[in-house]
Amino acid sequence: KIYEQCEAAREMKRLGLDGYDGYSLGDWVCTAKHESNFNTGATNYNRGDQSTDYGIFQINSRWWCNDGKTPNAKNACGIECSELLKADITAAVICAKRVVRDPNGMGAWVAWTKYCKGKDVSQWIKGCKL
């Protein structure tokens, strides 16, 4: 499913991401935009470590989920990576909350560091009926 921006914002808010671990809803929407363009079905294979990034937040199979093919995977979220590709983003949000609790916080996402960190991320939810 490809979410519209405000639709994604509403879902993320409903699932408790606004203010989670000190990050605003705008941070999460900005990150999802630059990671997957709000596409829950997005996958990207990383040749270097043979891992794959999954879903709206592009969560990686080396650390966070099990896809049965990533060498030395940790599965810290305790889920199948396929759960992260569903139209319903509940599992992706639960796992993203686990990711952000790590010391790196949202720095775990290259897109957040590059496009959202230190920026006015409120623009990502402007005009959305939340």
Curated annotation (Swiss-Prot):
Active site, renumbered: E35, D53
UniProt-listed SMART domains: LYZ1
Oligomer status and interactors: Monomer.
Temperature notes for this entry: Optimum temperature is 40 degrees Celsius. Retains the bulk of its activity after incubation for 1 hour at 90 degrees Celsius.
Domain spans labelled C-type lysozyme: 1-130
Hydrolase in keyword set: yes
UniProt protein name: Lysozyme C
Disulfide bonds: C6-C128, C30-C116, C65-C81, C77-C95
PANTHER family per record: LYSOZYME C (PTHR11407:SF28)
GO biological process: defense response to bacterium; killing of cells of another organism
UniProt keyword list: Antimicrobial, Bacteriolytic enzyme, Disulfide bond, Glycosidase, Hydrolase, Secreted
Cellular component terms (Gene Ontology): extracellular region
GO MF terms, alphabetically ordered: lysozyme activity
EC annotation from Swiss-Prot or TrEMBL: 3.2.1.17
Protein family: Belongs to the glycosyl hydrolase 22 family.
Reactions it catalyzes: Hydrolysis of (1->4)-beta-linkages between N-acetylmuramic acid and N-acetyl-D-glucosamine residues in a peptidoglycan and between N-acetyl-D-glucosamine residues in chitodextrins
Lineage: Eukaryota, Metazoa, Chordata, Craniata, Vertebrata
Other information: Lysozyme C is capable of both hydrolysis and transglycosylation; it also shows a slight esterase activity. It acts rapidly on both peptide-substituted and unsubstituted peptidoglycan, and slowly on chitin oligosaccharides.
pH dependence remark: Optimum pH is 6.0.
Transmembrane parts of this sequence: none
Function according to Swiss-Prot or TrEMBL: Lysozymes have primarily a bacteriolytic function; those in tissues and body fluids are associated with the monocyte-macrophage system and enhance the activity of immunoagents. Has strong bacteriolytic activity against M.luteus and V.cholerae, weak bacteriolytic activity against P.aeruginosa and no activity against A.hydrophila.
Enzyme class: hydrolase
Signal peptide start-end: none
InterPro entries: Glyco_hydro_22, Glyco_hydro_22_CS, Glyco_hydro_22_lys, Lysozyme-like_dom_sf
